[in-house]
A protein has these predicted regions:
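Catalytic cores and adjacent flexible loops of soluble metabolic enzymes
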Residues: 1-120
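Metal-ion/cofactor- or nucleotide/acyl-coenzyme-handling active-site neighborhoods
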Residues: 115-306
Length: 306
């Protein structure tokens, strides 16, 4: 079956048989439709009921690379099959057998940094300079009515601009939507182009396109966390203060998102590293701009309560 879907360890994999026949029996099967089906349909099911191995593991085997390369890219949760395949194809033969974290991170960053023309920073400063900003992340707390009311109250009290990240909530009107994840972007619909702010790794029409690499965090585990990237952009654009909603932190036992189709399998160690990384990054960013939480969060520190 495709992706070996089945109970426990799953079944033998269609895509592996196809690749084997192409290499050894002179067959000319196209694997791309199968892999796209995995990416778009079967992989989301796998995230809630895991079995067998992963798509990234298949690519690691295909390119005969150390499995930790696959794990590194998979844990990013930002790449489509096409993007991951493109990165694997650039791994040099002499680098494939032994895992080099710094090397794969450079390939990943180079892939994500590629893009077209960027919006002048002056244009963004005109939007945000001197303004309070409420950031709406897709954390599970934003599905709770009492938590939503806190957000409404904060927006009204501070006359804040509202920016959602990697999603477009229906329960509140957002002035802008900031997207850094191509997988999330592909699931969005009905957003006015002039309200869309994207990072340069996304090749799409938008009101504003900002450089990906300049917004990266210095903490490895959360280098390209979307909320941290947006805060960095707001600092560069002269915003006055930032309030966070739906930035809940990560749990490896419970749901993390307001939307089930956003759920990913969270390894306990990865979740801990992300939580500590985001907390540390917010503490650093708070030295340059006031940052506080509106909704409940595992990341919340006493001094950052709103």
């Amino acid at each position: 079956s495709i992706m070996g879907m089945g109970r426990g360890a799953g079944n033998l994999n269609t895509e592996l048989f196809v690749e084997y026949l192409n290499e050894t029996a002179g067959a000319d099967y196209s694997t791309e439709p199968i892999l796209c089906s995995i990416d778009n349909t079967i992989a989301p099911i796998y995230m809630t009921t895991a079995w067998g191995y992963s798509l990234s593991g298949y690519l690691s085997a295909k390119y005969r690379c150390h499995q930790n390369y696959a794990r590194f890219l998979n844990n990013k949760n930002t790449l489509t099959f096409e993007g991951m395949n493109a990165i694997f194809s650039k791994i040099e033969p002499e680098k494939r057998d032994n895992y080099d974290r710094e090397y794969i991170d450079k390939l990943y960053t180079a892939h994500m940094s590629a893009g077209g023309e960027k919006t002048p920073e002056a244009d963004l400063s005109r939007l945000f300079e001197g303004r309070n900003v409420v950031i709406i992340a897709p954390g599970r707390t934003t599905s709770v009515e009492s938590e939503r009311q806190k957000v409404f109250d904060k927006v009204k009290a501070t006359d804040a601009i509202v920016i959602s990240v990697n999603h477009c909530p229906e329960w509140i009107k957002c002035d802008y939507v900031f997207v850094s994840n191509i997988r999330r972007y592909e699931k969005l619909s009905g957003i006015e182009t002039d309200k869309l702010i994207i990072t340069s790794n996304i090749n799409a029409q938008a009101g504003y396109t900002v450089g990906y690499e300049p917004l990266l965090c210095s903490i490895e585990a959360v280098r390209d966390n979307v909320t941290l990237m947006l805060i960095a952009l707001l600092i560069r654009s002269g915003a006055s203060s930032v309030y966070l909603a739906g930035v809940d932190g990560y749990s490896f036992k419970e749901r993390n998102f307001a939307y089930r189709d956003m759920e990913t399998y969270e390894d306990e160690q990865v979740a801990k590293e992300q939580n500590s990384g985001i907390s540390a990054a917010i503490a650093q960013l708070s030295q340059r701009i006031p940052v506080s939480f509106i909704t409940k969060s595992l990341l919340e520190r006493e001094e950052n309560r709103s």
